Every structure is written in C-alpha cells, then in structure tokens.
Amino acid sequence: IQEDERGTYILNSKDLNMIEHLKELKDAGVNSFKIEGRMKSPYYVANVVNAYRRAIDNMDSLTPEYIQELKNELIKTSHRKYTTGFYFGADDKECLESTYPVQTHEFMALVIGDSDGQKVLIEQRNRFKVGDELEVLSPNDTFNKIIKVEKMENELGEDVQDAKNVQERLYLYTKLPL
C-alpha cells in the first residue's frame, strides 16, 4: 500500500501498450481494440485514441520511425511504465508497478468554438501565459503543431496575459485553424 497527496494506492498495474504490435494482433484475428479510459483524464483518452487511430489507419505501412513517433505521443500523458502484459508469454512477469505515473505534457485548454481565421474560443484547464508555446492535439492536420500564445482576450474583449482562472473561456489568437 502506498499513499501520497493524491490518494492511496493498493495495487498499481503497469499500463498495457501494444501500439507496436497492432499488425500482429490483426493477423491473429483481432478486429477491435479497446483502450482503458476508466479513471483517466479526457486528455489521456484523446491522446491515446489519437495515437492508436493513426497506427490503425496506417497499419500496413507502419515504419519503425512512425511507431516511435506514436510511442512518443503516448508518453506525453500521465502513465505508469508500459508492458505488453502476457501477449508474448510470461516475459514480463511483474505487471505491478510501485512507481508513480509520469507525464511530459499537460492538458492546457479545450477548443470549444470554431476558428474565425484569427482567434478561437477555448476553455482553460491549466495555467498558461502569453509567450508560452502550446502543442495541438487534434485528429486533423494540426496534430502536433506548436502555437505560440501571442494574444488572449476574455469574453468581454479584455486583454488577458495569464490564463489562471479554472475553466475560464478565452479567445486565443492564432492563424492556425483549430
């Protein structure tokens, strides 16, 4: 049993990650994939679904470089060490994890309105400021694009330098269609 400021943990299992073995699973007759989204953030679910969707859509032409790019996407969200479980026998006999989840990126905002070519309505989830760089997670061509926060306004049109109010709705100025 472990405890920290976020809660008590009795049995923490490693996170299953089969993204580099999807072709093998398909060849074995698997025709449907499921991710574990229970007790996960919307950012986690969106990021994992996005990575797996890209892998599935490109399954017949996956290169080692593209698989590594997708694996790099998966480590951005909060996760424990990865395992392939018992898919390949008992090589990874220790499925329990005693360390805490890690992540390299934070979920900053959710796009909630259409872009007008100059700005887009967002709902803030974590603090960021003018001058910060944000990476876009999207199912379209803006996937992985970096935008620099040049200007923000609240819904009254007032200038905002620091998005620090939880779930505040702001207009983020960007020429990138989001």
What are these language model-derived features?
Residues 1-178:
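Surface-exposed amphipathic alpha-helical tracts and adjacent flexible/coil segments at the periphery
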